[in-house]
């Protein structure tokens, strides 16, 4: 994406080489430039296999590794290095729908940071992973989401600290984080669409929670260090339990998990007693992937439009049953966000459409919907309700 759209648009990831395939490129760069590198095995977690190096000889030849330029001037909290674990929820890939959790975990190292190569082997100084630092004699847990103490803070505590103590514009910083999150998910969109078509029978089965690890440098610039596709939900500390517990609740409410209709009579009776209503299992009509030829024709015509003004004028005029199902799902999610923020699509995110490998109809549909009803959702919802009363979405 950086090669295609330039570093001006994709400059939020430190220079990274995938080894052993890109070892020659790493070798050439290290010959011309001094610097520190953090090397880690792909797919590893909890700080396993990570080390900080300055020479190519310190990196194994043939192992699968990721070498990333180390940010040697991070922002510090009382002299301590830290990073931020953010939670990103993908509820759909076509159309793309992304939510960013407003709370997160700030993980602090346990030894004061020294910018000196003689200290590169000190894992308690350079690694912020709680799974590493909990073995440090200096580690202090935190049981309060409102206090800036110990080696783990809540994200809201960090924002409050940076705002009041250092005068940081948190809204501007949050917008930068949203920007890098959206661009990162778009960079994987084409691959995820292709994979989902092969493995997913229904869009209702598609959702994924990601852990984004972000570091602030000395200028408060956010850098994306890595993305975890299976972030730990273990309550390692009292604060973890508080944050992750609420996260799990909001996450499950938002994805709208559907109870399968394969339950026996006894199980259904128990479920109805718990939910105090009938029809708690999903409706198979909503799971249909069949799209009529009229739907396909409309989609084809609008995907060929290369002007936003053109499709904004026409795409919402005659909604198809398939359109209505997509829009119902969209509005249902928004009503259950909890502490998640919908960051894509919004009425302002149309500028990201140019970064997609391919223009997809449903992204255009939601862009138009957000433009028309994003600031007045009740009007759009009333329109959908009228169509649903006629069972138009099931036709």
Where are these regions (language model features)?
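Glycine-rich phosphate-binding loop of ATP-grasp-fold ATP-dependent ligases
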Residues: 15-17, 34-60, 75, 84-85
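Acidic, PEST-like segments
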Residues: 1-4, 13-23, 29, 58, ...
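Short, acidic, Ser/Thr-enriched surface-loop or helix-capping motifs
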Residues: 217
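Hydrophobic residue at the +6 position relative to the catalytic HRD Asp in the kinase catalytic loop
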Residues: 212-214
